[in-house]
C-alpha cells in the first residue's frame, strides 16, 4: 500500500497541490460543529480527501471535535497505526507502558524521504546536542543537511479532552494535504506527536462521558483518579521523574533530540500561548527565553490577523520551576512551551461566561469574548491552527532552529568560564550515602553526567581566589591573623571518590537549575513551588564550586549510580529499604488512608512506599467508617494530606448529599475502579470513622497525619493540647526551610543532625500547650525611655521578676506565675503531653534555605513534627509534607522511622 501511495504522489503531486479535492462530508461537519465562523481559520476549515488514507470520519465514524464523541486511547492508536499502514509519510513507535500497562506511542510525520531516512535525521540532532564531540565545520554541515524536529504532546491532564481528537486530524492533514503551507512543513521538518500522555486517565475520562450520556439529569462522578498515582501533578514530575509517563516522554526526547517540546493543555480562554510573567528560572539561557517570546508573538499575531478572538500570551504562569514536562526540552537546550485552550471537559456545546480574562490588558489587547457558545470543535480549531503556524514557522526557519540548538549547547559547555559555577561537588564520605545515590540516579535519568574523583581534592570553592598581596594590604585581615594563630582556610577537602557534576557539559543548565539554591522575592507572583534544591530535599552535603580548577582533577564518568550503602544510617532512605527487604525483621501492618474528595497528594505517598519496597493496604475513609476495630487489622495508618482547599469537616462529612456517585468497574465504565471502588463517593469518614480511628490509637496504633489531616486530628479531638494558628503575613509557597531537632533520642529522628532541611508550603502553623503564650508586657507611659523601668513615686522601687523560662518539654505547659495551684486540675501529666520532635528554626533570619519566605517570624520556632500520645498509641503530626512529589527523600525517614518503630515510641 505504501509503495502504491508513494508512486501516486510522485506522479501527481503538482496536480494535487492545485486541484486536491476536499472530503466534503468532513468539511461540512467541521463547519457544523464550529459555533462561530470567527473560530475557524483557512488552515482548518476543510479536510482534503484521499482515496487511500482514512480520515477520522471514515475510520471512527465521526470527525475530530464532533458533538458527543470522545475517543479512547487505544482507538486513537488504532487510527494512528492505520495512517502508518496507509501512508509512507507516517511512522508509529511504541514509547512504553503506563503503570497500569497501557501503551504510550510516538507518531512521526514528514515527507517520504525523511521518514525513510528518519534514523539519519535523528542522528544529526543527536550529534548537534553535544558540541564536545563535533567540530564547527562538521556542525555547519549537519545544520545544512538536517531537519529540525517539533514534538507535540496531548492529554497530559485527563479532563482536558480536545488534544487527542485534534492530533488525529492534524496527523491526517500533515500526511495528505498538498497545499504549499503543509508541504513546506512536511518537507522541511519532522513532526512528532504523542496523542495521549496520561493514557490511564484518558480512558477513565471517556468512561465518565459514557456514564454521563447514559445518566442524563444526574451529576457525573468527578475524575478522582487520573493516573494510577497522581492527577494534575503528572505535570510536576520533571524533577523526580518518578512516573512512567515522564520517563516515556524523556525516552522520546533522547531518541530524537527535538528542538521544540510543546505540551497541549486546556483551561483558560480562548488560546494562551506560553511565555509567562516571570520570574524566569535564572539558569535559562537568554537566547532560549528570547525564542519563547518570538514564537509566541508570531502565533498571536498570525491568529489575530485571521480574526480569532482571545489569543494572547504573558499573563499566566511564571517560568520559574523546572518541574513541568516541557522542561524536558528546556533542560536539554530545546524550546519548551505549552498552550492553554478553552475547553468544556465534555464533548458538548455550552454557553460559557468569561470573566477576568475577557478584560483587555496590555498583554491581551484582543481578549476573549465575555460570553460565548463553546464547542469541542472550537477547541480543536484553535489548537490546530496555532500548532500548524508553529510548525510552519519551524519549516520557514529550518536552519535557525538547528543553529539555535547547537548554539545553546555550545553556550552550556562554556558555563564554567562564563557565568559559572564550574561544578557541584558531593563528598564521598556522606552520612546519608543512600540519599546521595538517589540524587545521582535522578541526575543520570535526566542525562546529566556525574563523575567520581580519582584522588582526594582540596580547593577554594570561591572564584577568583583572593591574591596574597590583596590579603596583606587589608589591615583588618592582618589584625585578624595576628589575633588568630590558626586562621580558617577557605579551602575545602573532598575525599577520593567524591562526586562531581561538571558544568562544562551540554546539560549544565539543567544541572544548575536542580542543584543551585533558589531565592524568590516576596512580591513576585509564583505559580508553583519556589524552592527545590535537590541536595537539601535529599538531605545530603554538597558544595557549589566556582573555581574552575576543580575541572582539572582526575575523575571518571559514572556509568551507573553508586552502590547502596551496606549499613545505612537511620536517616538514610536505604535504611527502610533494607529493613523491609530483610525477611527476619518484624514488619508492621500498614494502611494508607484516602478520602474520596481527592487522591493526588496521597498518591505520592503510595509511590514513595512502593519505591522503598514497603507493603501496604489501601483503604478509604468509608472503609474505616465501617471498621470498628481498625487496630485488629493494622498497626500503622498513614493519612496523607487531602490537598486543595479541604477542611476537617469535608473529611468527616464527605461531599454534598445527592444522587449516588459510583466509582467502580462496570460494563459501561470498564476503566474505573481497580485502584479502589465505591458505590457512592459522597459519604466521608463520618463521626463513626473518627471514633474508630480514636480507638485505633488508644489501643496502641500509630496514626500519621500530614498538613490538613493533622489539622483534622486536632479539630476532631484525636490529639489534645495542639492548636492550629491562623496566618497573618507568612508567604512560603513550596519553600525549603531549616528545621531543628528538639528531641534527639526519639526513634523518629534517629540518625538526623541537629538541623534538617524541611519542605513547607504555607500552612499549617501549629503550637502545643494548654495556655496562651505569655507575651512580654511593655512599660506604661512615664519617665525615661522605652527600656527604662517605671518608678512609682513615694516608695522604694521594686522590679518585676524575670519570667522563668520553661524547662525542656514544658513549652506550652508552664504553669502560671501566680496561684499555679488553681491550674493543677487542667495540667496534663508529662507522659500525656504532645512532644515536639522537630521545630522550624527559632531565628527567622535562619529559616530560609531555598525559595520564597516572607513573614518568617510567624513560623520561627513553631513545631514541624509533633508526637502526641493517646492511650497506648500515638498520633504523629507533620506541619511539613515529608513525602512530596518523590523529591523529599531527605524527610522520608521521619515517616519510615516512625513506621518501623511504631511500638517503641514511648
Residue ranges and their predicted role:
Residues 191-243:
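Mobile, glycine- and charge-enriched loop segments
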Residues 6-7, 480:
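Short amphipathic alpha-helical "recognition" segments used for binding
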Residues 9-17:
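Hydrophobic h-region of N-terminal signal peptides that target proteins for export
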Residues 18-190, 230, 236-237, 242-248, ...:
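Intrinsic-disorder/low-complexity accessory segments
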Residues 1-4:
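Positively charged n-region of N-terminal signal peptides that target proteins for export
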Residues 196-199, 209, 264-271, 709:
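Short, solvent-exposed turn/loop segments enriched in Gly/Ser/Thr/Pro and often Arg
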Residues 8, 223-225, 253, 330:
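Residue-level detector of transmembrane insertion/anchoring sites
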Amino acid at each position: 500500500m505504501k509503495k502504491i501511495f508513494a508512486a501516486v504522489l510522485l506522479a501527481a503531486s503538482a496536480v494535487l497541490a492545485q486541484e486536491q479535492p476536499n472530503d466534503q462530508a468532513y468539511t461540512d461537519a467541521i463547519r457544523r460543529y464550529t459555533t462561530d465562523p470567527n473560530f475557524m481559520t483557512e488552515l482548518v476549515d476543510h479536510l482534503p480527501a484521499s482515496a487511500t488514507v482514512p480520515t477520522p470520519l471514515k475510520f471512527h465514524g465521526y470527525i475530530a471535535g464532533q458533538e458527543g464523541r470522545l475517543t479512547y486511547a487505544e482507538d486513537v492508536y488504532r487510527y494512528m497505526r492505520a495512517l502508518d499502514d496507509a501512508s509512507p509519510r507516517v511512522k508509529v513507535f511504541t514509547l512504553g507502558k503506563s503503570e497500569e500497562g497501557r501503551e504510550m506511542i510516538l507518531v512521526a510525520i514528514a515527507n517520504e524521504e525523511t521518514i525513510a531516512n528518519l534514523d539519519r535525521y535523528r542522528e544529526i540532532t543527536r550529534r548537534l546536542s553535544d558540541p564536545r564531540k563535533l567540530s564547527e565545520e562538521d556542525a555547519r554541515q549537519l545544520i545544512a543537511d538536517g531537519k529540525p524536529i517539533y514534538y507535540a504532546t496531548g492529554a497530559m491532564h485527563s479532563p482536558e479532552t480536545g488534544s487527542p481528537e485534534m492530533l488525529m486530524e492534524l496527523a491526517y492533514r500533515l500526511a495528505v494535504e498538498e497545499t504549499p503551507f503543509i508541504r513546506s512543513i512536511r518537507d522541511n521538518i519532522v513532526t512528532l506527536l504523542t496523542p495521549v500522555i496520561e493514557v490511564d486517565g484518558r480512558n477513565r475520562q471517556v468512561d465518565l462521558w459514557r456514564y454521563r450520556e447514559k445518566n442524563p439529569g444526574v451529576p457525573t462522578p468527578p475524575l478522582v483518579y487520573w493516573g494510577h498515582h497522581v492527577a494534575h501533578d503528572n505535570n510536576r514530575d520533571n524533577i523526580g521523574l518518578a512516573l512512567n509517563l515522564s520517563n516515556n516522554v524523556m525516552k522520546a526526547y533522547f531518541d530524537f533530540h527535538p528542538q521544540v517540546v510543546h505540551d497541549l493543555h486546556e483551561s483558560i480562554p480562548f488560546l494562551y500561548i506560553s511565555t509567562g510573567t516571570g520570574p524566569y528560572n535564572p539558569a535559562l539561557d537568554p537566547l532560549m527565553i528570547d525564542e519563547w517570546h518570538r514564537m509566541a508573538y508570531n502565533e498571536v499575531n498570525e491568529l489575530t490577523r485571521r480574526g480569532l478572538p482571545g489569543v494572547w500570551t504573558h499573563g499566566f504562569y511564571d517560568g520559574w520551576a523546572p518541574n513541568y514536562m516541557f522542561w524536558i526540552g528546556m533542560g536539554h537546550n530545546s524550546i519548551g512551551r505549552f498552550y492553554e485552550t478553552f475547553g468544556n471537559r465534555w464533548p458538548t456545546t455550552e454557553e460559557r461566561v468569561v470573566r477576568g480574562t475577557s478584560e483587555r490588558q496590555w498583554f491581551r489587547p484582543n481578549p476573549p469574548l465575555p460570553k460565548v457558545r463553546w464547542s469541542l470543535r472550537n477547541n480543536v480549531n484553535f489548537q490546530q491552527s496555532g500548532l500548524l503556524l508553529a510548525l510552519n514557522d519551524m519549516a520557514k526557519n529550518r536552519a535557525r532552529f538547528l543553529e539555535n540548538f547547537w548554539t545553546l549547547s555550545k553556550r552550556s559547555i562554556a558555563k564554567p568560564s562564563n557565568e559559572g559555577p564550574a561544578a557541584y561537588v558531593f563528598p564521598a564520605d556522606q552520612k546519608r550515602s543512600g540519599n546521595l545515590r538517589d540524587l545521582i540516579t535522578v541526575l543520570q535519568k535526566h542525562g546529566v553526567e556525574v563523575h567520581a574523583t580519582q584522588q582526594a581534592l582540596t580547593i577554594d570553592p570561591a572564584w577568583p581566589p583572593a591574591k596574597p598581596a590583596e590579603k596583606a594590604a587589608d589591615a583588618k585581615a592582618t589584625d585578624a591573623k595576628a589575633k588568630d594563630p590558626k586562621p580558617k582556610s577557605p579551602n575545602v577537602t573532598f575525599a577520593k571518590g567524591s562526586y562531581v557534576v561538571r558544568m562544562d557539559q551540554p546539560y549544565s543548565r539543567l544541572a544548575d537549575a536542580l542543584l543551585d539554591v533558589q531565592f524568590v522575592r516576596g512580591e513576585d507572583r509564583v505559580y508553583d513551588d519556589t524552592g527545590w534544591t535537590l541536595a537539601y530535599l535529599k538531605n545530603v552535603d554538597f558544595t557549589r564550586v566556582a573555581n574552575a580548577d576543580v575541572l582539572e582533577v582526575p575523575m571518571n564518568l559514572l556509568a551507573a549510580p553508586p552502590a547502596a550503602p551496606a549499613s545505612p544510617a537511620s536517616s538514610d532512605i536505604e535504611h527502610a529499604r533494607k529493613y523491609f527487604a530483610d525477611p527476619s525483621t518484624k514488619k508492621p501492618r500498614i494502611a494508607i488512608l484516602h478520602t474520596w474528595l481527592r487522591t493526588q497528594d496521597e498518591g505520592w505517598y503510595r509511590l514513595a512506599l512502593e519505591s522503598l519496597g514497603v507493603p501496604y493496604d489501601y483503604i478509604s475513609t468509608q472503609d474505616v467508617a465501617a471498621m470498628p476495630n481498625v487496630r485488629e487489622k493494622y498497626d500503622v495508618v498513614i493519612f496523607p494530606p487531602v490537598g486543595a482547599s479541604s477542611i476537617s469537616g469535608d473529611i468527616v462529612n464527605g461531599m454534598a448529599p445527592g444522587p449516588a456517585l459510583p466509582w467502580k468497574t462496570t460494563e459501561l465504565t470498564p476503566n474505573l475502579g481497580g485502584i479502589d471502588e465505591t458505590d457512592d463517593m459522597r459519604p466521608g469518614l463520618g463521626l463513626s470513622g473518627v471514633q474508630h480511628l480514636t480507638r485505633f490509637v488508644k489501643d496502641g496504633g500509630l496514626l500519621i497525619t500530614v498538613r490538613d489531616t493533622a489539622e483534622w486530628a486536632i479539630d476532631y479531638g484525636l490529639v489534645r493540647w495542639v492548636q492550629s494558628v491562623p496566618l497573618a503575613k507568612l508567604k512560603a509557597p513550596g519553600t525549603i526551610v531549616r528545621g531543628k531537632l528538639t528531641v534527639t533520642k526519639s526513634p523518629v529522628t534517629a540518625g538526623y543532625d541537629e538541623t534538617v532541611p524541611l519542605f513547607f508550603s504555607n500552612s499549617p502553623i501549629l503550637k502545643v500547650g494548654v495556655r496562651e503564650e505569655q507575651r512580654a508586657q511593655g512599660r506604661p507611659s512615664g519617665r525615661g525611655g522605652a527600656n527604662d523601668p517605671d518608678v512609682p513615686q513615694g516608695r522604694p522601687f521594686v522590679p518585676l521578676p524575670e519570667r522563668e523560662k520553661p524547662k525542656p518539654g514544658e513549652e506550652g505547659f508552664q504553669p502560671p506565675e501566680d496561684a499555679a495551684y488553681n491550674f493543677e486540675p487542667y495540667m496534663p501529666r508529662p507522659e500525656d503531653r504532645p512532644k515536639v520532635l522537630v521545630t522550624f528554626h527559632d531565628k527567622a533570619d535562619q529559616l530560609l534555605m531555598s525559595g520564597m519566605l516572607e513573614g518568617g517570624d510567624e513560623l520561627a520556632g513553631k513545631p514541624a513534627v509533633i508526637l502526641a500520645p493517646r492511650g497506648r498509641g500515638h498520633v504523629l503530626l507533620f506541619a511539613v509534607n515529608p513525602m512530596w512529589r518523590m523529591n523529599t527523600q531527605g524527610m522520608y525517614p521521619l515517616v519510615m522511622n516512625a513506621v518501623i518503630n511504631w511500638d517503641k515510641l514511648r
